[in-house]
Amino acid sequence: LYIGIKVMNKPKTIFCDIDGTLSEYPYSAEMGNYQFDKWNMKPLPGTIAKLWEWDKAGHMIILTTGRKEGMRRITEEQLEAAGIIYDRLIMGIGGGARVLINDLKPDRDGDTAIAINLKRDTGVKNVKI
Protein backbone atom coordinates (compact mmCIF):
# COMPACT_ATOMS: atom_id res chain seq x y z
CA LEU A 1 0.00 0.00 0.00
CA TYR A 2 2.85 2.39 0.71
CA ILE A 3 5.34 3.38 -1.93
CA GLY A 4 8.87 2.24 -1.18
CA ILE A 5 11.29 4.95 -0.17
CA LYS A 6 14.42 5.42 -2.25
CA VAL A 7 17.26 6.84 -0.22
CA MET A 8 20.85 5.87 0.47
CA ASN A 9 21.55 2.14 0.69
CA LYS A 10 23.23 2.41 4.10
CA PRO A 11 21.30 1.21 7.13
CA LYS A 12 18.79 3.79 8.25
CA THR A 13 17.67 5.26 11.55
CA ILE A 14 13.95 4.67 11.95
CA PHE A 15 12.02 6.80 14.46
CA CYS A 16 8.70 5.19 15.41
CA ASP A 17 6.00 6.36 17.77
CA ILE A 18 4.65 3.68 20.12
CA ASP A 19 0.96 4.27 20.89
CA GLY A 20 -1.27 4.07 17.81
CA THR A 21 1.70 3.29 15.53
CA LEU A 22 3.25 0.08 16.90
CA SER A 23 0.62 -0.80 19.50
CA GLU A 24 -3.12 -0.36 19.78
CA TYR A 25 -4.07 3.07 21.04
CA PRO A 26 -7.40 2.24 22.71
CA TYR A 27 -5.79 0.49 25.67
CA SER A 28 -4.52 3.83 26.97
CA ALA A 29 -7.89 5.50 26.44
CA GLU A 30 -9.62 2.71 28.37
CA MET A 31 -7.23 2.68 31.33
CA GLY A 32 -6.29 6.36 31.55
CA ASN A 33 -3.00 7.86 32.70
CA TYR A 34 -3.64 7.02 36.35
CA GLN A 35 -3.60 3.25 35.77
CA PHE A 36 -0.67 3.30 33.39
CA ASP A 37 1.03 0.37 35.10
CA LYS A 38 -2.01 -1.83 34.37
CA TRP A 39 -2.00 -1.22 30.61
CA ASN A 40 -1.66 -4.36 28.52
CA MET A 41 0.22 -3.26 25.41
CA LYS A 42 -1.04 -5.03 22.28
CA PRO A 43 1.17 -4.79 19.18
CA LEU A 44 -0.71 -4.00 15.97
CA PRO A 45 -0.76 -6.80 13.36
CA GLY A 46 2.57 -7.13 11.56
CA THR A 47 4.47 -4.92 14.02
CA ILE A 48 6.77 -7.57 15.47
CA ALA A 49 7.68 -9.04 12.07
CA LYS A 50 8.35 -5.58 10.61
CA LEU A 51 10.62 -4.58 13.51
CA TRP A 52 12.61 -7.80 13.13
CA GLU A 53 12.85 -7.19 9.36
CA TRP A 54 14.28 -3.71 9.98
CA ASP A 55 16.63 -4.98 12.67
CA LYS A 56 17.92 -7.78 10.43
CA ALA A 57 18.60 -5.19 7.70
CA GLY A 58 20.82 -3.33 10.18
CA HIS A 59 18.54 -0.35 10.72
CA MET A 60 18.61 1.53 14.05
CA ILE A 61 15.13 1.49 15.62
CA ILE A 62 14.41 4.44 17.89
CA LEU A 63 11.04 4.51 19.61
CA THR A 64 9.50 7.84 20.56
CA THR A 65 6.62 8.60 22.87
CA GLY A 66 4.82 11.43 24.55
CA ARG A 67 4.82 9.37 27.75
CA LYS A 68 6.65 11.15 30.54
CA GLU A 69 10.17 10.13 31.60
CA GLY A 70 8.78 8.91 34.92
CA MET A 71 6.97 6.17 32.98
CA ARG A 72 10.19 4.80 31.43
CA ARG A 73 10.51 1.66 33.57
CA ILE A 74 6.94 0.50 33.03
CA THR A 75 7.09 1.43 29.32
CA GLU A 76 10.25 -0.67 28.89
CA GLU A 77 8.55 -3.56 30.70
CA GLN A 78 5.46 -3.25 28.49
CA LEU A 79 7.57 -3.16 25.32
CA GLU A 80 9.48 -6.26 26.40
CA ALA A 81 6.30 -8.15 27.34
CA ALA A 82 4.77 -7.23 23.96
CA GLY A 83 7.87 -8.42 22.08
CA ILE A 84 8.62 -4.98 20.62
CA ILE A 85 12.36 -4.67 19.91
CA TYR A 86 14.25 -1.37 19.65
CA ASP A 87 17.68 0.21 20.02
CA ARG A 88 16.76 3.43 21.83
CA LEU A 89 13.72 4.89 23.57
CA ILE A 90 13.05 8.65 23.66
CA MET A 91 10.44 9.65 26.24
CA GLY A 92 8.46 12.83 26.85
CA ILE A 93 8.36 14.34 23.36
CA GLY A 94 4.81 15.61 23.80
CA GLY A 95 1.78 15.30 21.60
CA GLY A 96 2.49 18.01 19.02
CA ALA A 97 3.75 17.55 15.46
CA ARG A 98 7.21 16.00 15.09
CA VAL A 99 9.61 17.61 12.64
CA LEU A 100 12.87 15.99 11.49
CA ILE A 101 15.51 18.24 9.96
CA ASN A 102 18.60 16.77 8.31
CA ASP A 103 21.23 17.91 5.82
CA LEU A 104 21.45 16.66 2.23
CA LYS A 105 24.68 14.81 1.52
CA PRO A 106 26.56 16.52 -1.35
CA ASP A 107 28.06 13.23 -2.54
CA ARG A 108 24.80 11.25 -2.58
CA ASP A 109 21.50 11.37 -4.41
CA GLY A 110 18.25 11.12 -2.52
CA ASP A 111 16.61 12.46 0.57
CA THR A 112 18.21 12.02 3.98
CA ALA A 113 15.02 12.68 5.95
CA ILE A 114 11.59 11.21 5.32
CA ALA A 115 8.25 11.41 7.13
CA ILE A 116 5.52 8.80 6.95
CA ASN A 117 2.18 9.67 8.52
CA LEU A 118 -0.08 6.71 9.30
CA LYS A 119 -3.70 6.67 10.37
CA ARG A 120 -3.91 5.70 14.04
CA ASP A 121 -3.85 1.95 14.65
CA THR A 122 -3.07 0.96 11.02
CA GLY A 123 0.42 -0.15 12.03
CA VAL A 124 3.71 -0.39 10.17
CA LYS A 125 3.26 -3.74 8.41
CA ASN A 126 2.93 -2.11 4.96
CA VAL A 127 5.72 0.45 5.41
CA LYS A 128 8.64 -0.17 3.07
CA ILE A 129 11.97 1.36 4.01
Q: Where do the language-model regions lie?
A:
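Short, Lys/Arg-enriched N-terminal segments with co-localized hydrophobic residues
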Residues: 1-7
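HAD-like aspartate-dependent phosphatase fold
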Residues: 7-129
